[in-house]
Structure formats: C-alpha cells, structure tokens
Amino acid sequence: MAITATRLVSLTLLWIVVLFVTLALIQIKLTDVADPSVNEKILDAKLNQVGEDLEGVTHKVYFDIQINGSPAGRILIGLFGNIVPKTAENFRSLCTGEKGVGNMGKPLYFKGSSFHRIIPGFMIQGGDFTRGDGRGGESIYGDKFADENFKLKHTGPGFLSMANSGPDSNGSQFFITTVTTSWLDGHHVVFGKVLSGMEVVRKIEAQGQDSGVPKANVIIFASGEVSL
C-alpha cells in the first residue's frame, strides 16, 4: 500500500506540472495575440531571418538612407523579376541611374530623392525624383506603364509595391509596407521585398505622421545594385 500511495503522489505531481506548463503556454499565446507590437516584432524577425534565402529574387538593389543629413543605414531589397519583369527592371534601372535623363529633363535615378510620404503603421513612400512632393516621377519606359499583374500580395511588412494614381498609372513612385496591407492587393503591383535593413525602414517610419508629411528630411543618399 505504501508503494501505491507513493506512485499516486508522483502521478498527481506530474499532472500538476503538465497542467501548469499548458496554462503557461496558453497565456503566452494570448499575450502575443493581445499585443500587436509583439506580432510585429515576430514578423520583422522572420523577415530578416529568411531575407537572403527568398526564392525568386532575380536582382538585389539598395538604398543608403540619410535622415536630416545623418546616415541612417542601408536597405537591401530583392526584386522578383521572374514574376513581374517589367516592373522589376524599371525599379532596378532607377536604382542604378543607367538610363540617363528622362523625358522630363531629370535623371532617371533615385539617388538624391526623398521619402515624401510616411504614415506610421502603414508604409513609407518615395520615388518622386522630378518634383519631390508625390506629383511627379517618371518610368524608364516614358511616362506611365500598365499594371503588370497582381500575383504577389502585401502579406506583411517589408514588401515593395508600386504607388499609383489609379489603374495602369505606374511611374517611379513606390512604397514599402510596414504592416500587412491586404486591402491594396489587386490595386498595387508588388515586385520586391526587403532582405535586410528593416530596422532602417522603421527609422524612416518613425519620422512620419498620420497626415503623411514627414517630420524630417529622409533622403536616398545613394542607390544601386549588388550581385546576387
């Protein structure tokens, strides 16, 4: 009887431990769901973790960023040229500046242009190298070009997508998401993703306002292409 009682006590203690661990795991899960910032940090970590291993990246380009004249870091972006070749090539060429001067008399080059629209909890937008206020920009194909396809989706932070003023109005303006923006699917062409430097994107995001007007001067100090 003494052995049976000992086993009973051991089993009881084991069940208590199992129950405690289960409740702790449930609490952790509920905390993640209740706190969006936790989920955003997890998404950012996953984004950086898989960055260099993303399948389908055909080119890598970069932005070196300055905020109010001070270096803020580099954003490395992968382009999906197999899925959206025309859109990816437009962006790649604008990063290198290899196409020279456009029809508007301005260099087809992101270098020196600003992030003119920054909305925290949404996205950062740039690419207007002709006017700098969101009313300009030019593609390497002339002025505007058609939406290539909407195969890629805005499924999290760090996706690169074309800004537009309606269907088939793509130029040089782009945005990088800082959250999931699924309502933009089917309206804006996704063509790339941040591979590294999401912390720089967050620095830029911190300079935004609900109005979209930046609180600081955020400049693409240098841009170009790097080898795969």
UniProtKB/Swiss-Prot annotation:
<dbReference type="GO" id="GO:0005783">
    <property type="term" value="C:endoplasmic reticulum"/>
</dbReference>
<feature type="domain" description="PPIase cyclophilin-type">
    <location>
        <begin position="62"/>
        <end position="225"/>
    </location>
</feature>
<dbReference type="GO" id="GO:0005802">
    <property type="term" value="C:trans-Golgi network"/>
</dbReference>
<feature type="glycosylation site" description="N-linked (GlcNAc...) asparagine">
    <location>
        <position position="170"/>
    </location>
</feature>
<comment type="similarity">
    <text>Belongs to the cyclophilin-type PPIase family.</text>
</comment>
<keyword id="KW-0413">Isomerase</keyword>
<keyword id="KW-0697">Rotamase</keyword>
<dbReference type="Pfam" id="PF00160">
    <property type="entry name" value="Pro_isomerase"/>
</dbReference>
<dbReference type="GO" id="GO:0005768">
    <property type="term" value="C:endosome"/>
</dbReference>
<dbReference type="InterPro" id="IPR002130">
    <property type="entry name" value="Cyclophilin-type_PPIase_dom"/>
</dbReference>
<keyword id="KW-0256">Endoplasmic reticulum</keyword>
<protein>
    <recommendedName>
        <fullName>Peptidyl-prolyl cis-trans isomerase CYP21-2</fullName>
        <ecNumber>5.2.1.8</ecNumber>
    </recommendedName>
</protein>
<keyword id="KW-0325">Glycoprotein</keyword>
<dbReference type="GO" id="GO:0005797">
    <property type="term" value="C:Golgi medial cisterna"/>
</dbReference>
<dbReference type="GO" id="GO:0005794">
    <property type="term" value="C:Golgi apparatus"/>
</dbReference>
<dbReference type="GO" id="GO:0006457">
    <property type="term" value="P:protein folding"/>
</dbReference>
<feature type="signal peptide">
    <location>
        <begin position="1"/>
        <end position="24"/>
    </location>
</feature>
<dbReference type="GO" id="GO:0005886">
    <property type="term" value="C:plasma membrane"/>
</dbReference>
<dbReference type="InterPro" id="IPR020892">
    <property type="entry name" value="Cyclophilin-type_PPIase_CS"/>
</dbReference>
<comment type="function">
    <text>PPIases accelerate the folding of proteins. It catalyzes the cis-trans isomerization of proline imidic peptide bonds in oligopeptides.</text>
</comment>
<dbReference type="GO" id="GO:0003755">
    <property type="term" value="F:peptidyl-prolyl cis-trans isomerase activity"/>
</dbReference>
<keyword id="KW-0143">Chaperone</keyword>
<keyword id="KW-0732">Signal</keyword>
<dbReference type="InterPro" id="IPR029000">
    <property type="entry name" value="Cyclophilin-like_dom_sf"/>
</dbReference>
